[in-house]
Amino acid sequence: MPESKPDPSVFPPTAPPPRLVASGLYLVATPIGNLRDMTLRALDVLAAADLVLAEDTRVTAKLLSAYGLKAKLERCDDHASARAAEGAIERLRAGEVVALVSDAGTPMVNDPGFVVARAVIAAGLPVHPIPGPSSLLAALCIAGLPADRVLFAGFLPAKSGARRAALEEVRTARQTLVFF
């Protein structure tokens, strides 16, 4: 049988290859202690990203290096999230792929990245979750407690008075409680 050639009208020789990852903001979960917990889809998104927003660029640079990936990194911590949101929206409007990662686990869980996601959603641009490691779910799995009703209370305040008040708020809760 003769070898078939691709139809040049579909993919002309000068056309760029099709993108495997569509433009959008991708909330990419990262490992929480074992680099082998990274998902293949997360690696695909990070490889395709025009920009990776990171809580700590040094931590994310090590992660990318472990997988042989290179990406433009920008800081997205408590002090830079508003500026990162503006830059992300500009890039997304230009058709680029922007990934948002936290230092460990799933972005948006006690993480300043929510400022970026909220702004992108408000701008009517696409946001895609890339699931993976989650310390919240890992804690529930090993606790041996019912997980059908759960209250996640995040980090308790550092000051004792505020911490007592936060615990008092949930003292009568009938759900399994999870704190960081």
Ranges and model annotations:
Residues 75-83, 156-160:
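Conserved helicase motor
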Residues 32-35, 103-107, 158:
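Short glycine-rich anion-binding loops that position phosphate/pyrophosphate groups of nucleotides
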Residues 46-52, 124-128, 177:
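Short active-site oxyanion
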Residues 93-153:
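Short glycine-cluster motifs
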Residues 79-93, 112:
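Short phosphate-binding loop-to-helix
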Residues 2-78:
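Glycine-rich, flexible N-terminal cofactor/catalytic loop recognition
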Residues 23-25, 94-99, 175-176:
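Loop/turn-to-beta-strand initiation segments
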Residues 2-15, 22-23, 134, 138-180:
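Beta-strand/loop-alpha-helix module characteristic of Rossmann-like adenine-cofactor folds
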